């Protein structure tokens, strides 16, 4: 624009003197401008290329006196000191005008101010001509989520302190800005009693665990999870921000331009923002962007991590703006000269005589996105111990080795280390080829291709020769020796005759439940019975009340070990399962039916315990005694038996909403069985919480556990098939992902240590003689027939649980009716 308007004017003037701007009349006059015009008698230069006009009155000292506009004829004023670095640098000095405005100019060791000013004028001219675009961008910011700070107009981003003070004019006005002296923090600026005040918003990090933390914000008293919530509280309640100042905020000062414009207007680094701040209502005086490498580097280093505006310019294969071409070219040149600017994530291959390296292109546009392999001769190597976000230190051609990387400070989830049982070959899973394993005995050898090199293996695969693997993953192939191979059956299993002649038998996929209520022969129940028969409920309650809690726990443990296939597993069952224990089977895909059976028994037991409490037709004291007995059985299951599976079922029954709402019953328990109530509150409930958070290894010795906690694992694996009263409590926790990882790691340990659980159960049940009647009421089939009847026991699990949940709610309200207001609602 300037080149077209002033192309006819001379441009070969000397530049070693400082000249003022002259008007268009001076160009036509033959008189010397020194006699009539003073250097301080002109206003600011217009940013649209028009010529300056003469100003009447006392002449202020302005920044436009220090440089000349492109295309104007300069007139000499006085000799100028030559700088050793540049011929036309500007003297750096702040000046005060009559309004107290502070103007700070650039470093003298920069480029020509004329070129920079024209560039700034063009950008400002383009920005001024697109108000609709800025308005639309501002509306998009304000339509973000209410918890996003950018969606609130009273947030002004990184504006200087002086600018924020000028924006608040009346008592109660406020805005929130970024702290320039403490990046990452926020400051609330307000006016109270005709005085601008600044309050730093205290930021506190609450570390919940090693991997999770929560950030809270506060002034003096109450803390909030977000800054918008803090502002809403103080504005809505007219609460003083501090007791000392008594400042109250109620009138927000809203921004009228997007945050991007404010950021470009004032700069991003604290030092630059203070030097180039716009003061006292002069939005047309903007900080000039530096074209030097130091300015570009400073802006890049001081950007916040979440700044998406700057990331747009750094990504992709094309430059974001052609105006910054020289900046990027200088940055590219610096990057090639200094090792500290090596791109993260790639290595420069060492130069050798055998590899020709092509020179870098002369184009200033360079790629900052993905880097394709330009030459097949250059081999890209990736270090195995590389960390995400680790900067490279020098090229590979250096003689000195790189120092070891610093440990990562970001917390991450750690999987518990596997026990020594994982090193045993019997505990490892292997990939079996039925066609190959069928013809191989104990002494059979692998084909020669399997013992040779990878090339021979590929050759055999092309010839369709059978191999020991089906997948395309390459495994290490061991030489022929006396050690056991992972694809061969274990020696101990071979001696027991699990597989005849070493042949592989495909595991049996079970599709029918092991619980058959209609085929169950009971001493108490007729062939066909109705649900919740009163006589059967009383008989089961008498057996439960008259037996010792430890005896009841032993019967429950014995039945759990058979259902989970920890004890009483025959050779035929092992052959059908493909593994030796049900604890390992529930982690495998074909263990679907066993997982359903485990869920069935757990939920049926919990419902049965709840019915034992709610179905009592006796007095309040009888219900309190039943509660006490159940808590004692839970203690025995936890301490003596090590049966965490049934322990969780009893705790689930006690924590049902239909049970916890019985305030009179729990009060009677505390009065009559104080020690039992304390034991439940202080020991059982915290222990149950630790179990469901996957931290049982910290409070339970492994050698004391006979049946581990199974429900979190089987519930996760069968979530689409079975649901009971929504998700579990641990899944609603803030640390649910870490808890799930703990449960999955525990499942791996269960599969590895299945033999240890079996030996613990055999040791605990040694010499145990079960009672026939007590043993029957502990069976799942009896409980299903008692609760749902002979016909209802065949209905789908989900439907049965939903209907019985309504029955439990009705029984609970019958024992202790809700208040009248709740009943009316």
From Swiss-Prot:
Keyword Phosphoprotein part of the UniProt annotation: yes
Protein's cellular compartments: Cytoplasm; Cell junction, Focal adhesion
Positions of post-translational Omega-N-methylarginine modification: 442
InterPro entries (alphabetical): Ras_GEF_dom_sf, RASGEF_cat_dom, RASGEF_cat_dom_sf, SH2, SH2-Ras-GEF_adapter, SH2_dom_sf, SH2_SHEP1/BCAR3/NSP1
A Pfam match: RasGEF
Site (Required for interaction with NEDD9) residue list: 748
Gene3D superfamilies: Ras guanine-nucleotide exchange factors catalytic domain, SH2 domain
Keyword Transmembrane in annotation: no
Post-translational modification: Phosphorylated on tyrosine residues.
Major site of localization recorded for this protein: cytoplasm
Tissue specificity note: Ubiquitously expressed. Found in several cancer cell lines, but not in nonmalignant breast tissue.
Domain Ras-GEF: 548-818
Keywords, comma-separated and alphabetical: Acetylation, Cell junction, Cytoplasm, Guanine-nucleotide releasing factor, Methylation, Phosphoprotein, SH2 domain
Residues the record lists as N-acetylalanine modifications: 2
Polar residues: bias regions: 79-94
Region named Disordered: 40-106
An example Gene Ontology CC term for this record: cytoplasm
GO molecular-function term, one example from the UniProt record: guanyl-nucleotide exchange factor activity
UniProt-annotated stretches for the region Mediates the interaction with BCAR1/p130CAS: 744-748
Note: Overexpression confers anti-estrogen resistance via RRAS-independent activation of the PI3K pathway, and activation of the cyclin D1 promoter in breast cancer cell lines. Plays a role in insulin-mediated ERK activation and DNA synthesis in breast cancer cells.
Domains (record comment): The SH2 domain mediates interaction with tyrosine-phosphorylated proteins. However, not involved in the binding to phosphorylated BCAR1. Required for cell cycle progression in response to INS/insulin. Required for regulation of EFR-induced DNA synthesis.
Name of this protein: Breast cancer anti-estrogen resistance protein 3
């Amino acid at each position: 624009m300037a080149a077209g308007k002033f192309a006819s004017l001379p441009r070969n003037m000397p530049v070693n003197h400082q000249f003022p701007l002259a008007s268009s009349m001076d160009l036509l006059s033959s008189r010397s401008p020194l006699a009539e015009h003073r250097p301080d008698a002109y206003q600011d230069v217009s940013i649209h290329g028009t010529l300056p006009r003469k100003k009447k009155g006392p002449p202020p000292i302005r920044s436009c006196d220090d440089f000349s506009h492109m295309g104007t004829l300069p007139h000499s004023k006085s000799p100028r000191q030559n700088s050793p670095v540049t011929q036309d640098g500007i003297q750096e000095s702040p000046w005060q005008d009559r309004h107290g405005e502070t103007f700070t100019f650039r470093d003298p060791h920069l480029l020509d101010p004329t070129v920079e000013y024209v560039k700034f004028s063009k950008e400002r001219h383009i920005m001024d001509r697109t108000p609709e675009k800025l308005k639309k961008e501002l509306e998009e910011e304000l339509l973000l989520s209410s918890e996003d700070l950018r969606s609130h107009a009273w947030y002004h981003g990184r504006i200087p302190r002086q600018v924020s003070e000028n924006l608040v004019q009346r008592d109660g006005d406020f805005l929130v800005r970024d702290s320039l002296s403490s990046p990452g923090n926020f400051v609330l600026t307000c006016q109270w009693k005709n005085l601008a005040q600044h309050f730093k918003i205290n930021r506190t990090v609450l570390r919940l665990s090693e991997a999770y933390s929560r950030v809270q914000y506060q002034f003096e008293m109450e803390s909030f999870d977000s800054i918008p919530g803090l502002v809403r509280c103080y504005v809505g309640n007219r609460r003083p921000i501090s007791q000392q100042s008594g400042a109250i905020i109620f009138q927000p000062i809203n921004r009228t331009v997007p945050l991007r414009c404010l950021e470009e207007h004032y700069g991003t680094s604290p030092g630059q923002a203070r030097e180039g701040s716009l003061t006292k209502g002069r939005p047309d005086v903007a900080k000039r962007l530096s074209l030097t490498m130091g300015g570009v580097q400073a802006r890049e280093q001081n950007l916040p991590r979440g700044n998406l505006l700057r990331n747009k310019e750094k990504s992709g294969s094309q430059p974001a703006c052609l105006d910054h071409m020289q900046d990027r070219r200088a940055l590219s040149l610096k990057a090639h000269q200094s090792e500290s600017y090596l791109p993260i994530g790639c290595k420069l291959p060492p130069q050798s005589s055998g590899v020709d390296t092509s020179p870098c292109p002369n184009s200033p546009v360079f790629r900052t996105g993905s880097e394709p392999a330009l030459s097949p001769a250059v081999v890209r190597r990736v270090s195995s111990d590389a960390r995400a976000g680790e900067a490279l230190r020098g090229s590979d051609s250096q003689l000195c080795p790189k120092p070891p990387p610093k440990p990562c400070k970001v917390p991450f989830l750690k999987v518990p280390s596997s026990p020594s049982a994982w090193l045993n070959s019997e505990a490892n899973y292997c990939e079996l080829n039925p066609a190959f394993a069928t013809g191989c005995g104990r002494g059979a050898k692998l084909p020669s291709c399997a013992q040779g090199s990878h090339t021979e293996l590929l050759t055999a695969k092309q010839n369709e020769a059978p191999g020991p693997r089906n997948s395309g993953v390459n495994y290490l192939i061991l030489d022929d020796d006396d050690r056991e191979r992972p694809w061969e059956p274990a020696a101990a299993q071979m001696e027991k005759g699990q597989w005849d002649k070493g042949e592989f038998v495909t595991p049996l996929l079970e599709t029918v439940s092991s619980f058959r209520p209609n085929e169950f022969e009971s001493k108490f129940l007729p062939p066909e019975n109705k649900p919740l028969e009163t006589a059967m409920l009383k008989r089961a309650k008498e057996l439960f009340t008259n037996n010792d809690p430890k005896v009841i726990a032993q019967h429950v443990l014995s039945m759990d070990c058979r259902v989970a296939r920890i004890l009483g597993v025959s050779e035929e069952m092992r052959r059908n399962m493909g593994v030796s224990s049900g604890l390992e089977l529930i982690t495998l895909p074909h263990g679907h039916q066993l997982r359903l059976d485990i869920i069935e028994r757990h939920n049926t037991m919990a419902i049965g315990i709840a019915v034992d409490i709610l179905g009592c037709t006796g007095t309040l004291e009888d219900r309190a005694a039943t509660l006490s007995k159940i808590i004692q059985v839970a203690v025995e299951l936890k301490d003596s038996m090590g049966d965490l599976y049934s322990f969780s079922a009893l705790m689930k029954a006690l924590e049902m909403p239909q049970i916890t709402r019985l305030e009179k019953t729990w009060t009677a328990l505390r009065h009559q069985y104080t020690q039992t109530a304390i034991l439940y509150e202080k020991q059982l409930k915290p222990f149950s919480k630790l179990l469901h958070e996957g931290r049982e290894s910290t409070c339970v010795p492994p050698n004391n556990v006979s049946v581990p906690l199974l429900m979190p694992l089987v519930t996760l694996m069968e979530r689409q098939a079975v649901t009971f009263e929504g998700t579990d409590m641990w899944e609603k926790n803030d640390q649910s992902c870490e808890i799930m990882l703990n449960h999955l790691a525990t499942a791996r340990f269960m599969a590895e240590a299945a033999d240890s659980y079996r030996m613990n159960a055999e040791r605990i049940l040694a010499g145990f003689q079960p009672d026939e009647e007590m043993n029957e009421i502990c069976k799942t089939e009896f409980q299903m027939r008692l609760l749902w009847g002979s016909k209802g026991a065949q209905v789908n699990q989900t439907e049965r649980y939903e209907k019985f949940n309504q029955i439990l709610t009705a029984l609970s309200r019958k024992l202790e009716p809700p208040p009248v207001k709740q009943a009316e609602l």
